């Protein structure tokens, strides 16, 4: 993702530069999903973005590199697209795992936390006993089967209460407004029965 933005910065240590943009293509860390990385470049600006966090609605870009004290004007932002795509895959896999856990262990299972990384994911859950090897294998098989089906996702914007009534699952740690983005996928359950899972974003 490429974008041109106005900017301001502050040096908080000898090698770490905090940058605030008027708009940003970088996703900030949220709900267990780590922030984007990439570069910010401009006249007298050469930065590598190592992390992005959200502070009261403002995205803070943690960077290393150089900024000329007299630098001004717009900068060009470039997100590491391959890394973001891997994060997106593991984000979707988190939703698939949540649904598989509910189907195999029961509706009492809730997400208690997560970590979505480009190379792996971690899913924390509530359950009354340790999972058996057979249960873990069954969950893994179900998630991998859904991934291999490669079903298209249906993305829509709905009222929060309506989405919840239709069975959409909220992500742990996320805060939602009156309108939410809902991702859903048709899922096969045996030869005849078909169902849908949906997750709020």
Protein language model features and the residues they cover:
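Single conserved hydrophobic/aromatic residue that forms the stacking wall/gate
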Residues: 1-7, 11, 186-201
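A glycine- and charged-residue-rich anion-binding loop/surface
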Residues: 8-188
């Amino acid at each position: 993702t490429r974008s041109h933005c106005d900017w301001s910065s502050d040096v908080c240590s000898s090698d770490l530069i905090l940058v605030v943009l008027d708009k940003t293509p970088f996703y900030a860390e949220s709900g267990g999903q780590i922030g984007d990385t990439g570069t910010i470049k401009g006249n007298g600006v050469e930065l590598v973005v190592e992390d992005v966090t959200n502070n009261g609605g403002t995205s803070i870009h943690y960077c290393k590199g150089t900024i000329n004290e007299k630098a001004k004007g717009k900068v060009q932002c470039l997100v590491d697209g391959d890394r973001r795509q891997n994060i997106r895959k593991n984000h979707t896999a988190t939703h698939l795992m949540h649904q598989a856990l509910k189907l195999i262990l029961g509706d009492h299972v809730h997400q208690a936390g997560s970590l979505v990384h480009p190379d792996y994911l971690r899913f924390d859950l509530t359950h009354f006993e340790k999972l058996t090897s057979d249960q873990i294998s069954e969950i893994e098989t179900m998630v991998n089967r859904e991934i291999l089906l490669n079903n298209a996702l249906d993305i829509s914007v709905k009222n929060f209460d309506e989405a919840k009534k239709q069975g959409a699952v909220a992500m742990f740690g996320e805060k939602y407004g009156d309108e939410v983005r809902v991702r859903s996928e048709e899922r096969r359950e045996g030869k005849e029965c078909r169902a849908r899972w949906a997750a709020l974003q």
